[in-house]
């Protein structure tokens, strides 16, 4: 949604399985890659992306294959924070393409304000699932089990005084 709002020509969603495909396309992506369901995904999509924003937080992510998706002078920006170090890769693959790896945090207050302004201007709405506050513990367990689609919002279920 934000990539399109910022003028991206083509947006590709990437996840392990096809389970999120329909949602990703509804959010505005033009294409979808399932890394565990399609064994040749990196060959089929080699050198097809200028920018890859990686939200993966697993040290088991297929980093070498992600780097193969980058075009010459492409960039991989890591925003997910793995619990351990990133997987190893051959630096030569970056040098030959002139590719870069970088990182980014959530942003400063001004950038967050700009993002919210853009969201309002382009009518970008979050995909959330409301959960009652009384089920907060269950929501945490469900979130850790990967059941959240895509953010849980805890709602106070106490009557207003």
Label each region the model flagged.
Residues 52-53, 77:
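N-terminal Rossmann-like NAD(P) cofactor-binding module of classical short-chain dehydrogenase/reductase
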Residues 75-77, 89-129:
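Rossmann-fold dehydrogenase core element
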Residues 14-18, 35, 55, 80, ...:
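N-terminal Rossmann-fold cofactor-binding loop
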Residues 70-72:
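Helix-to-beta-strand junctions that scaffold the AdoMet/dcAdoMet cofactor pocket
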Residues 43-50:
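A short acidic, Gly/Pro-enriched loop at the edge of an enzyme's catalytic core
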Residues 1-37:
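Mid-domain Rossmann-like dinucleotide-binding core that forms the NAD(H)/NADP(H) cofactor-binding site
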Residues 64, 109-161:
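C-terminal hydrophobic helical "lid"/dimerization subdomain
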Residues 16-23, 85-91, 111-112:
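Short, glycine/polar-rich helix-capping loops at beta-to-alpha or helix-loop-helix junctions
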